[in-house]
Regions:
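GNAT-family acyltransferases
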Residues: 1-111, 118, 136, 176-205
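Loop/helix-junction capping segments adjacent to catalytic residues or to phosphate/diphosphate-binding pockets
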Residues: 16, 123, 154
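Glycine-centered small-residue hotspots that permit tight backbone geometry or close packing
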Residues: 110-113, 159, 165-169, 179
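Conserved acetyl-CoA-binding loop-helix of GNAT-fold acetyltransferases
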Residues: 113-116, 122-139, 158-162
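Conserved GNAT acetyl-CoA-binding A-motif
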Residues: 137-148
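Conserved beta-strand-loop-alpha-helix junction that forms the acyl-donor binding cleft
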Residues: 147-157
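Conserved catalytic-core motifs of GNAT/GCN5-like acyltransferases
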Residues: 148, 166-183
Length: 205
């Protein structure tokens, strides 16, 4: 059953220790680079925790280039992350966009990505977090957002459809993500009734 106490919070130095603990327990907010990304985050935090927190809200894309799975780098997009919080750290959800358009660079797999820590899964937190993030995304003036999933990630697909998402296409990700990596593209409209009000009991993540 969904626990309604979960909310999205702006990352802070006060809540950072629980984020660090999750990384050390093997969780990663990056569903593709996984352990490599977790190690990078831990290194950044150890070097300058305040700077790491500041990078979590980067509407002007000043945080430096982004590293792709093959080690190549690409310019950062404007974006920000929120942490899922129910009195404890539950996971992360991020939103990125190109100002003035719904289009994304080909290397960018969707506007929104999320990851729940394993010990908080099964509470519907990803479904609720996505709905809450859609409300924030709507403020950027986009008509829709796109998300991508692996073809076999049924749980994440339910999170998306539970927030009004519709399937768009099956495609292959850029070579930087690995040869012949299939992905599914989904779209959620940000016009009309807010999808964040729909289906919050349907997701299992």
């Amino acid at each position: 059953m969904l626990q309604q106490s979960m909310e999205l919070i702006v990352p802070s130095l006060e809540t950072l220790p629980q984020f660090v603990d999750a990384l050390k327990r093997g969780w990663s907010p990056d569903n593709i680079r996984l352990e490599e990304a977790a190690r990078e985050f831990l290194g950044m935090i150890a070097k300058d925790a305040a700077a790491f927190i500041a990078r979590c809200t980067d509407r002007e894309a000043k945080g430096g280039d982004v590293t792709l799975p093959d080690g190549s780098t690409v310019p950062r997009l404007p974006g920000f992350v929120r942490w899922m919080w129910d009195g404890e750290f539950c996971g992360q959800i991020g939103f990125r966009w190109q100002p003035g358009t719904e289009a994304l660079p080909k290397h960018c797999l969707g506007h929104i990505g999320y990851a729940v820590v394993p010990w908080k899964r099964g509470n519907g937190y990803a479904t609720k977090a996505l709905g809450l993030m859609l409300a924030e995304a709507r403020q950027e003036g986009l008509r829709w957002v796109e998300l991508t999933t692996d073809p076999d990630n049924v749980a994440s697909q339910k999170v998306i459809t539970g927030n009004g998402g519709v399937f768009i296409e099956r495609f292959f990700a850029e070579a930087a993500y690995g040869a012949d990596r299939p992905e599914l593209r989904w779209r959620i409209s940000l016009t009309g009734p807010g999808p964040e009000s729909q289906g919050r009991e349907t997701g299992s993540m």
